[in-house]
Amino acid sequence: MAPNTQANGSQVSAHLATPDGDSGNSSHDRFDLFSLRWAAGDRWWHRSNYTGAFLFNTAAFILPALYSTLVKIWIAKIDSSLVVTTDVYTYINTIAEVINDGLPRAVWVTIADTEARSLKARLGLAHSLMVFQALLGLLMSVIFVAAAQQFASAFVPRDVRAASITYIRVSAFSALSSAIEVAVSNATRALDKPDIPLLISSFKVAINIALDLLIISTFHVGNWNPDINIQAGIRLTCDMAAAISGLFYFLFTVSFRRSADAPTLQGFIVLLKPGSITFIESALRNALYLWLVSGVVSMSADYATAWGVFSTIRWGLIMVPVQAAEATTLTFVGHAWGLFKQRPYPPRWSWASLCGTIYLRPR
């Protein structure tokens, strides 16, 4: 739909068909949107092609899901009653998802719009997003630390509540790492660079697994007795290191080479208009989910543990391909939406016109 002109050797010229169906191009230049050429054509493995981007995104999402399963196994070896405590990390990130579904989801109609803005301006929006998300994530982390007792009373069973306070306070700063990671990941996907989110996930999971094997696994080095708080510290360290590494990799390989715009208040306002809609939707959706979770937790530790295991399986088996398809599709729809908005035709568009054609004119 929005192929990379450098990678594919073609120039996107005429975009969607006019409302009256007159394309103005010869039939051999026509590229039907319902054709699979945009997904499996030349260089299908490339990150600027839908199939290639989908593979990158699938790998990026599946690695954290795999690690979440391993964590539960290792914690069960330490103390099976504390497996439910590891779900605190999930619930903190669920609350953080509210801010991660705000401005970061606005990238698909702003940063992904290749027609309305230059690459320099799109990079400036990405920088504004990253700065604002980092500030919001830091604020949310401080709130979690201050309200650790109240958080435990809502999302941790009574039997292990006292033993989970430190775990909550350590895991609180995962809201900051999550905010940075999501901002970088969404912005780079909108810029047709899904390899950067994959780099972040690969680095995070690889270091996490290596340190967990060395420190908290059943065959760890040393003579100490590992506990759940050590695991929380390892996970937080790796999350922060991966998020910051991905940020600096993006800045040094893309932003500095392109002399991109600096973060601005105007960039924040551009993102705020579409982002406020997704923010409200996410707040309502996640509030209902957390209300359901608190009800399950209040029933018993067994129910809470079972719910956590079910959620881990669900995110691993079902939601990974769904998230990968969503992120990839939103990127390419954002590109096409930018093309669509540049059409000079003011009348209302019919459904047939919206399912129009794209034209590729060889160089």
PLM regions: where:
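Interhelical loop/hinge segments that connect adjacent transmembrane helices in multipass membrane
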Residues: 7-54, 228-286, 294
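Signature of the first transmembrane helix
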Residues: 22-35, 48-108, 276-298
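Transmembrane helical elements of multi-pass membrane transporters/channels
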Residues: 52-71, 170, 204, 234-246, ...
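Small-residue-rich hydrophobic transmembrane alpha-helices
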Residues: 76, 83-138, 181-190, 307-363
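Helix-loop interface residues and adjacent transmembrane-helix termini in multi-pass membrane transporters
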Residues: 77-80, 190-191, 218, 225, ...
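Short runs within selected transmembrane alpha-helices of multi-pass transporters and secretion channels
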Residues: 104-108, 170-190, 197-205, 231-247
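Alpha-helical transmembrane segments of multi-pass membrane proteins
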Residues: 146, 158-184, 363
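Membrane-interface helix-loop junctions in multi-pass transport and translocation proteins
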Residues: 195, 205-244, 363
